[in-house]
From Swiss-Prot:
Domain of life: Eukaryota
Tissue and organ distribution: Expressed mainly in stomach, placenta, small intestine and colon, as well as in normal mucosa of esophagus. Down-regulated in esophageal squamous cell carcinoma.
UniProt KW keywords: Nucleus
Protein name: Normal mucosa of esophagus-specific gene 1 protein
Entry similarity comment: Belongs to the complex I NDUFA4 subunit family.
Subcellular location: Nucleus
Presence of keyword Nucleus: yes
Principal location class: nucleus
Gene Ontology BP term (one): response to bacterium
Gene Ontology cellular component annotations, sorted alphabetically: mitochondrion; nucleus; respiratory chain complex IV
Length: 83
């Protein structure tokens, strides 16, 4: 008995199959979308410390209210010493 014959015999399974197919498709498309975003880093060999390339003058949050972004002197000194 094939899958479609089973669905035609038990019609109450059709909505379940449709919802599961849509959910699996949505989850798969979101996973692929997440991999192509620039926030996700998969190649750690080229840039093992990606947080050092973040510009401190650019806010990284969705909402920033009255916040000043300043470089931290101690971190700047550590970066200069390690490079």
């Amino acid at each position: 008995m094939s899958f479609f014959q089973l669905l035609m015999k038990r019609k109450e399974l059709i909505p379940l199959v449709v919802f599961m197919t849509v959910a699996a498709g949505g989850a798969s498309s979101f996973a692929v979308y997440s991999l192509w975003k620039t926030d996700v880093i998969l190649d750690r060999k080229k840039n093992p410390e990606p947080w050092e390339t973040v510009d401190p003058t650019v806010p990284q949050k969705l909402i920033t209210i009255n916040q000043q972004w300043k470089p931290i002197e101690e971190l700047q000194n550590v970066q200069r010493v390690t490079k």
